Swiss-Prot record:
It comes from the Viruses. This is Non-structural protein 1, peptide 2. Belongs to the rotavirus B NSP1-2 family. It comes from Rotavirus B (isolate RVB/Rat/United States/IDIR/1984/G1P[X]) (RV-B).
Amino acid sequence: MEFNQFLKEASGKVDLVPIYMSNPSCNPIHSSRKPGKVSALKYDNPLKECPEIPGDSVLISDVCPFIHEHFCGGIHIPYQHNMRPKGRITHVSADKIVWPCGLRSIKLDGKLVVGHMFVKCRCGNMYPTWISGESDFFFITCCANDTPAIKIGLANGDKCQNCLRLKRWYNPGPGFKSGINHYIAPFFCPVCTPIRDLVSNMTRFGAVSFDSPDYAEMKRNYDWKRSYPNNCESAFRSLNSPLIQTLPTVCDTVCASSGTTVTEMIASINRSWCTGFKIIPINRTRVLLKDDYRGRIIEFQDNNHLHNQIMAAMTEWKFL
């Protein structure tokens, strides 16, 4: 499928891998151990993509198409000027910039790039759903405290069966603990290999563990105004490509306690009225707000619009 088609039609997060019209006989999904969790994005030719270099990251996370506030372990695509990414979405090459939660603005080529319409990340900090300013970079948002990644290393001489570029070694990056420093995928380069196969390949050679916050604790804290430390600056430096490390500068961070989020408002109503309201996503611009007795499908343009409509519905139902 095409990237914009994925944003419009996807009903949940998924691992996105590239396939190429110049090599139609190959599809990495067919050799994946969990093909049901992988989808393919079609591209014309890998030669049009930004080249891989040692030090690039591949985020070990699914891509989530939703922009409303929800507890999620994936990376997200904010509204932005450039909505035509090249190559694998989770491959942080020199044409992409990772925007960790907790970051409000950066200075890029002397221009200020600012995030807007913040929602709550799974760690309790805030990430933007719209990034203003004209830029050729493609922005993705992620959790600054809980986004594991692998680092691309040197080429080993063999060719990837999918993109036909040289295969590369890869190393455990942020979020991993491993006694081995270098791995090689059997058929494809790290950029073309599904993330679960990358991790599975690492476990074949010894004990590998995720160095991440407790998932159950983050889930419990999500309804309350609790957050992990704001580590956006260290995540920004560790996850982005070394080719752009000197270009952007972190200018401002966002406080997790500034204002009440949609999730916190609904959780407060549920505790006060003993109800069970929840937001169920339908697609990128539609959600279902419901409890056991009533429900409403809400179409929205952005998160401010969604917040206002949820407050209007709660007022109409006399919960506010």
